[in-house]
């Protein structure tokens, strides 16, 4: 599906959702994630809230979309977009949220994830960047620890 078509469809759906249920934009983390499945169905999930004892947390929209896909016996994702329900801007999902999409089906390494209304990248490039950042961070930690150990008394 063309870039601007999928983005426009999801944005329109998000705007309608907020008009009907304004409370859904409950925080800056309120989002909608839409996944274009292999059969061209659009499966969406909206951020939700969970409670453990008296502590609340947010369930990511991406996770909710994956659960919806699983419930519909679908696993193959072609495109994925996450929008803020506050200002309808494109939100790049966290790597942990991308990994659940990739884990659903080996072919999802080709899923394109929107990074702006007019641009997307393969899911693997976002995960590779995270892996590289993590490796650099780990190397820096090891260097720092080695330096600290060198000066230990």
Describe each PLM feature range.
Residues 10, 29, 57-61:
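Generic hydrophobic secondary-structure packing signal
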Residues 47-48:
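Residue-level structural signal for beta-strand termini and adjacent loop
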Residues 27-38, 124:
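Short beta-strand scaffold segments in enzyme catalytic cores
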Residues 2-24, 72-153:
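C-terminal binding/interaction regions
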Residues 41-42:
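Hydrophobic "anchor" residues
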Residues 51-67:
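A short, polar/charged loop-to-alpha-helix boundary motif
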